[in-house]
Amino acid sequence: MTTTVEKTFNIFDILIGTEGEEGFGKKPVIIQGMTGSYGSTHTRLMKAYGTNIPAGVTPGKGGQKFEDISVYNTMSEAVEATGAQISGIFVPAPFFLKAAAEAIDSGIKLLVAVPEHIPIRDAIKVLEYARRKGARMIGPNTPGVIVPEVMKVGIMPAQPFKAGTTVVFSRSGTLMYDVSYNLTGKGYGQRLCLGIGGDPINGTNLIEAFELVRDRDDVESIVVVGEIGGDAEEQLAQYIISTNFIKPVIAYIAGRAAPKEKRMGHAGAIVYGNYGSAESKVTNYAKANVPVAKRPAEVPELLAKKLRK
């Protein structure tokens, strides 16, 4: 697993800025594909949550308004008008490569790539191009990212999340909601919740996600929601050990009962032999002193025990 995290890349500064400074929590976000059925629905929901969306991009519809938001033909026009560094991409998969490249060329630093069914070759091209340009991609096939009670970019519902000091990183969208709901119900609010994405190629993998928060004083603990398939969790366990990651970590792994060599839901959720199996992940997490919950409701129980130690 390749990991490249620029130490100068501060996801919180880009998403919300610094508390006390002008514009805190109101960083501008551009929505690509805003006027499509998918993009328009979630633009309304993001705006209602508090996300500052001053512009959207739909080629051929420049000059129009949607929900009192200006529509531009190109990303360069939208970025010039707003100064945005964040893009939420809601275009259909066949248009993703062009849309993402245009965003990066326009100076966008954080791309939230929501669409599923992105060809692996296209995802790799965007990932490599983003790294060369000093940008970061979340996704593809991600529910997005949310700073609870401040802003969100993506498709997640608002109800499960509450502000706090726990971070949730998840390979599954719905399980990110479920785990966060259980954490909230037991009084463990979230500082950040980020969907890694369910595809084999991740713009920001688990190790890179951990690096984004490891030195932050406002992050007390991390919950990582994994699933069968691939070796992301095994690599993460080794990272926790080798870098002496000291923040408390709790894990949940979906798909424990899944049959081997059968894809379950996500393109990345497939087990070959013992490679990518739940047993392999649990074993490696145990070596890293990471408790693994058997169900989402058990996550806050394990977190409480971990924090008491």
What kind of feature is each model-predicted range?
Residues 2-309:
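Catalytic-core regions of core metabolic enzymes
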